[in-house]
């Protein structure tokens, strides 16, 4: 299937479904790598399915992704800012013990994931 869209819209869509996930995967791997000695080894030893699945794309070509990030920086930074706001809101909910907010966000994530499966995108 071929879709057409305006270039700016394309950049925003790809920023959220491709570029931001790669940036997050590279970053969480970097965070794990920066842990001190024993903790770093334990991260590798005890990495559960979620960490392995989430970070699979961190094995991608660093030069290619550097160029993608820099050539699409405006859309990527816009989506990163939105993500950071959402992550901060989730952090506040965890800190303040807001189970309704946390559950709502998890539920919304499940809906998106199930939609991908139904569309045979997963």
Say what each PLM segment does.
Residues 111-122:
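Long, positively charged, glycine-interspersed low-complexity recognition regions
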Residues 1-56:
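Internal alpha-helical scaffold of NAD(P)-dependent oxidoreductase catalytic cores
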Residues 39-108:
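Interdomain hinge/lid region at the active-site interface
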Residues 24, 87-89, 112-114:
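A short hydrophobic/aromatic micro-motif that marks alpha-helical segments and, especially, helix-coil
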